[in-house]
C-alpha cells in the first residue's frame, strides 16, 4: 500500500511517498481503509524532532493523527464494529498514523463518523475538536453566561471553540484576522475583533474576560501582557504559549496536552450531525502532496485546515 513516511527527523523534505506492507490487525485492533487524514501543527513539530521526549515515535514513522475512513478488517476480541462502518478517530500521538491507504487503530478509539458531511471532511474534526472541548470544559471549566476571549479564533481549534462556547451559553469575543470575520460572526460570536494589539489593552476589545483561550504562539513577554485580558478570578487556558497565572488577582492558568477521548469525540460528532457544530475545511489535497502541505504550513502559505485524501 502507499503511505507517507519519514526515516529521520528534519524539514518537510524528509517526507516520502512510498510502498509499505499493509498491516494486519491484532487483538483489539481494527484495520481501517483511510479516506483522509488532516494536517495539524503537531505533525510538523513531531516530524522536525522537536517533541521526541514528549511524543517518542519509532522511525520510520507514518504521520497523521486524525483518521476518517471505513472499517476493512476486525482483529480478535473486537465487538461493536462491522466491516464497512464509517469511522473517525484521534490516533495515539506516538502511534503509526493515518497518512496511508490503511491504518491500524485501537478499537476503543473509533467512533461512528458524522453522517451529514463528506467522510474526507470528517478528518478535520478529531484532534482540533478534542483540543477545543478539553480546553474549554476541562481546563477553563466554562460555565453559562461567562465572558470568553478566543485569541486565534480564525484557526481550526479556534473556530470550533467559538461554536462550543456559544452553544454553552457564553458571551464570546473572537480575535482573528479580517478574512475570518464573517465566518466567526456566523458561528455566533458576540464580537469579532482583529488581531490583538497588546499595547491597547483589554478595554479596547471589551475586556477583561472571565475566560481567555490562547491558541496562538507568542513570545513569553507577550503572554505576560496577555494575562491582563483575564478578569480577577478568571482563567487563562492555552493550547500554545502558556499565559502566566497571577495569584495576586486569583487568575488561574492551564495548558493543554490533548488526548484521545472516544466519548468526547462521539459528542462532537453528534453536534456536527444536529447542526450545532460546523467544520471548516480550507483545502483538500491528495496524500501524495503531504511534503508540500508541510512546507506550506512552515512558510505560512497554508490557507487553513487541510485534509489529505488517501489514494
Can you describe what each PLM-predicted range is?
Residues 21-39, 51-94:
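Glycine-rich beta-strand-centered segment in the early N-terminal region that forms part
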Residues 56, 89-152:
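NAD(P)H dinucleotide-binding glycine-rich loop of Rossmann-like/cofactor-binding domains
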Residues 87-88, 148, 212, 236:
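Generic structural signal for buried aliphatic residues
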Residues 265-311:
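C-terminal hydrophobic helical "lid"/dimerization subdomain
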Amino acid at each position: 500500500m502507499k503511505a507517507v513516511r519519514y526515516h529521520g527527523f528534519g524539514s518537510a523534505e524528509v517526507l516520502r511517498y512510498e510502498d509499505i506492507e499493509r498491516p494486519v490487525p491484532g487483538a483489539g485492533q481494527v484495520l481501517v481503509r483511510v479516506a483522509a487524514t488532516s494536517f495539524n501543527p503537531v505533525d510538523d513539530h513531531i516530524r522536525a524532532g522537536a517533541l521526541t521526549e514528549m511524543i517518542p515515535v519509532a522511525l520510520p514513522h507514518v504521520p497523521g493523527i486524525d483518521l476518517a475512513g471505513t472499517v476493512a478488517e476486525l482483529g480478535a476480541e473486537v465487538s461493536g464494529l462491522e466491516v464497512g462502518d464509517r469511522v473517525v478517530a484521534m490516533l495515539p500521538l506516538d502511534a503509526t498514523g493515518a497518512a496511508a491507504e490503511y491504518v491500524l487503530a485501537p478499537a476503543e478509539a473509533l467512533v461512528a463518523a458524522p453522517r451529514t458531511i463528506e467522510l474526507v471532511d470528517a478528518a478535520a474534526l478529531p484532534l482540533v475538536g478534542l483540543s477545543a472541548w478539553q480546553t474549554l470544559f476541562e481546563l477553563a471549566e466554562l460555565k453559562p453566561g461567562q465572558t470568553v476571549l478566543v485569541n486565534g479564533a480564525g484557526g481550526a481549534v479556534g473556530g470550533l471553540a467559538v461554536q462550543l462556547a456559544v452553544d454553552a451559553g457564553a458571551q464570546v469575543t473572537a480575535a482573528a484576522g479580517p478574512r475570518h470575520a464573517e465566518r466567526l460572526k456566523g458561528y455566533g460570536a458576540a464580537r469579532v475583533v482583529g488581531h490583538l494589539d497588546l499595547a491597547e489593552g483589554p478595554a479596547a476589545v471589551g475586556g477583561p474576560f472571565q475566560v481567555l483561550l490562547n491558541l496562538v504562539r507568542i513570545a513569553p513577554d507577550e503572554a505576560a501582557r496577555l494575562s491582563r485580558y483575564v478578569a480577577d478570578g478568571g482563567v487563562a487556558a492555552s493550547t500554545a504559549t502558556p499565559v502566566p497565572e497571577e495569584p495576586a488577582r486569583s487568575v488561574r492558568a492551564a495548558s493543554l496536552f490533548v488526548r484521545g477521548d472516544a466519548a468526547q469525540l462521539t459528542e462532537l460528532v453528534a453536534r456536527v450531525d444536529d447542526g450545532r457544530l460546523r467544520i471548516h475545511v480550507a483545502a483538500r489535497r491528495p496524500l501524495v502532496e503531504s511534503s508540500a502541505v508541510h512546507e506550506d504550513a512552515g512558510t505560512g502559505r497554508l490557507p487553513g485546515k487541510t485534509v489529505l485524501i488517501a489514494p
